[in-house]
Amino acid sequence: MNAQPTRAAATAADQYVLTLSCPDKQGIVHAVSSYLFMTGCNIEDSQQFGDHDTGLFFLRVHFSAEPPVTVDKLRASFAAIGDSFHMDWQLNRADEKMRVVLMVSKFGHCLNDLLFRASIGALPVEIAAVVSNHTDFAELVGSYNIPFRHIPVTRENKAEAEAQLLELVREQDVELVVLARYMQVLSDDLCKQLSGRIINIHHSFLPSFKGAKPYHQAHARGVKLIGATAHYVTADLDEGPIIEQEVERVGHGVTPDQLVAVGRDVECQALARAVKWHAERRILLNGRRTVVFA
């Protein structure tokens, strides 16, 4: 009598994630699920969304497969299905950490939070480097044995500084750049070259209080909720597709400085979730919006 494979043995298979968007029509899920079945894959989790406004369909499938299945073989064999449905698709190993670069200026709470979460395995990322236009956090970053890169930025050398960043991204095979309170405005050209690959944390509940000193703007309006917004960076300042938002209730007696203090926590929470979801390939762009399979 042969023993049946245990669940523990099944989970030892290689893990993959397929994400796609395409014009909505009948047969998409059938085509994908049939393909996975015919290639010997097992669906672990599947989420989908059809947007009636844009006419687009979005799908994320987490599946497993035993060797000799490989990611390269899967990509090659899935291409025909992708073409037939005019899909924008990606297929990746789910168990490989995404390589990221963190960028920071003078406020270190988001940087510190991301470094700690990554160090304990709470974020599925590998931090390739931390880049800053100041040297304040070089020692902190060094304590995690992560390379620290000081790239000063002035009006005169901005193009050169961004060229250094792009070179680092390419050399280190970086998939995501995280602006963890990096206070320099990126050029239109850089935003286009890294479109969909830069996440920023803005310290307000967008679309309210854009630009500088949003907590002071919020205080002047007497808000009862303050928030933070993690979004993709575009050439339009603080206008990129929103990924995640977090809020905290405040009373009428709080000062602008107290709002800043409360805001640090919500900034960290919103940014950490956005980075985690991006690294797990749970976010799909839908025009100026996002679809988040959280």
Task: Identify the meaning behind each predicted range.
Residues 118-126:
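A short alpha->loop->secondary-structure connector
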